[in-house]
Amino acid sequence: MKTTYASPADLPADQGAKPAVLVWDAPVRVFHWLMVLSFAGAYLTAESERWRLLHVTLGYTMVGLVGFRIVWGLIGSRHARFSSFVRGPAGVVRYVRSLFKGQPEHHVGHNPAGALAIIALLGLTLAIGASGWAVYNDVGAEWIEDLHEGAANF
């Protein structure tokens, strides 16, 4: 299995090519690839009545995976914890400013902008799951189906 590392190029010049640092643990990697496969499968089966049960099952799987990631983000290993990379709006602004200055802040793992994207994707996945559940159970109006499809295509 390949390992995700912090870039050795980011080390100070006097440290040379020291061994890279392991960042993401196995649960985060498994979560990531199960989410990718579940989303791809759900997306590919979205328009088929024949594969509707698989589509729904993959959607529920994604919601379960988000639940797992939230728990692991609170109790997991050091770099898996949200507290290690979620820095709030001020951190995102500071990081983006450092990009525009041409001197980006170095972060092991996710930078604050990446953390914002992760939180948005987890929330979007929950919205897709909730709207999908409502569509599948005929709860609500037609706009919920539009929301479900629009969020998945976003």
Placement of each model-derived feature along the sequence:
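Membrane-embedded alpha-helical bundles that constitute the cytochrome b-like, heme-associated redox core
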Residues: M1-F154
